[in-house]
């Protein structure tokens, strides 16, 4: 290869792995960390790994855009903190909408850099923006995985921060987002007894 000529873009599985590496690299610098197996790691990076792990269990052989979207669902989330928006429901919704657009644009830039075609980039971005939830099976699968990861890995922290009435409200809203299959899987999660009781009361 002559001097000044850039390396060709990766293709196939190597392109997917490079995209994941770039997503993880972007997430690794987050200021919010948690202790995982004796090492402090960015919360966004830990979350990304939870998402991939749960998707692999929930839908083995998921299409590539869905696998990509799961990995970058919260990419660099710390860049747009909740505190920038008004308190209350309207401020929360504005924050979530702004985050979805930010995640889609950030992921799109990485995907184009590693050689993905526009149709794949746009598909991943649509998944991240949750376009056509309930009508698009892949969007619904992503939402199911998000909810399952929340229940399995983050509900305990929420339980420590909110009263019981608030928790039940959160759980009911989470349940409404899920498909019947997602709900069935949720009921099999290995939750602490107090959390399982809360879930059963919320959805019973």
Task: Enumerate the predicted regions with their spans.
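Divalent metal-dependent phosphate-bond-processing catalytic cores, especially two-metal-ion Mg2+/Mn2+ enzymes
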Residues: 4-21, 25, 38-42, 49, ...
């Amino acid at each position: 290869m002559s001097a000044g000529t850039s390396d060709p873009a990766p293709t196939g599985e190597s392109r997917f792995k490079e995209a994941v590496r770039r997503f993880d690299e972007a997430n690794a610098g987050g200021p919010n960390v948690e202790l995982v197996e004796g090492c402090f790691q960015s919360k966004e990076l830990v979350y990304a790994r939870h998402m991939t792990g749960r998707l692999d269990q929930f839908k083995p052989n998921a299409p590539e855009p869905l696998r990509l979207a799961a990995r970058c669902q919260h990419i660099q989330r710390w860049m747009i903190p909740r505190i920038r928006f008004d308190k209350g429901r309207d401020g929360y919704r504005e924050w979530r909408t702004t985050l979805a657009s930010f995640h889609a644009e950030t992921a799109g830039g990485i995907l184009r850099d590693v050689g993905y075609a526009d149709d794949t980039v746009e598909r991943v971005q649509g998944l991240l923006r949750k376009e056509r939830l309930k009508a698009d099976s892949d969007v619904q699968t992503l939402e199911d995985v998000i909810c399952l990861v929340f229940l399995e890995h983050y509900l305990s922290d929420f339980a420590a921060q909110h009263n019981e009435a608030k928790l039940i409200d959160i759980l009911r809203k989470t349940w409404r987002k899920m498909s019947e299959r997602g709900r069935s899987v949720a009921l099999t999660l290995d939750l602490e007894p107090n959390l399982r009781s809360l879930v059963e009361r919320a959805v019973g």
